[in-house]
């Protein structure tokens, strides 16, 4: 089966232990999570999980359905890279003496539109925002010059490229149902 990198976006209420429940769905199916980012969403009280994993379409559909069944999950959807806009951030700690001695290092940093955010006599810190591939390529080119001391990257953050936000519609529908039930109780 062909494996594709899928991004699952989960919206949930903010309850302790839910992250463990969500990751357990992947563990039970022996699917490795490539990146995981959890943060507050644009809706108060709702958190957004952005999870990436390599798998096939049938498996990602099953995983998404299992996650959706969790009590505190409002909704979960999976996407391919052409259905989302995604970004990461990376920090590269490089040796300042090599940065000063080899002009290629500065050229590579400029080529990838990265920026130097800290410089001292021992090391410099380079920051790169962008697509996963660009971040990896910059790392590989800097590593080839033997100047990388440390490297760290964030998990993927993503938004859908569709014209609507599914969670907003879901919450509006949920609120309308709640109000109707309250009105019926008042009758």
Can you annotate each of these PLM segments?
Residues 1-48, 57-187:
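Long, contiguous binding/interaction regions
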């Amino acid at each position: 089966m062909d494996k594709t990198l899928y991004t699952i976006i989960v919206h949930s209420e903010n309850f302790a232990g839910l992250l463990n429940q969500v990751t357990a769905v992947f563990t039970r199916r022996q699917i490795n999570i490539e990146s995981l980012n959890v943060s507050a969403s644009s809706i108060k009280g709702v958190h957004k999980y952005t999870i990436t994993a390599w798998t096939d379409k049938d498996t990602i559909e099953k995983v998404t359905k299992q996650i959706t069944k969790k009590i505190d999950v409002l909704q979960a959807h999976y996407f391919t890279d052409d259905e989302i806009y995604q970004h990461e951030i990376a920090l590269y700690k490089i040796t300042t003496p090599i940065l000063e001695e080899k002009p290629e290092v500065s050229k590579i940093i400029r080529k990838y539109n990265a920026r130097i955010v800290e410089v001292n006599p021992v090391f410099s810190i380079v920051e790169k925002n962008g697509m996963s591939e660009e971040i990896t390529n910059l790392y590989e080119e800097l590593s080839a010059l033997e100047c990388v001391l440390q490297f760290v990257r964030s998990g993927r953050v993503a938004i859908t490229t569709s014209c609507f936000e599914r969670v907003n519609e879901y919450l509006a529908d949920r609120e309308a149902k709640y109000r109707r039930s309250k009105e019926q109780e008042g009758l």
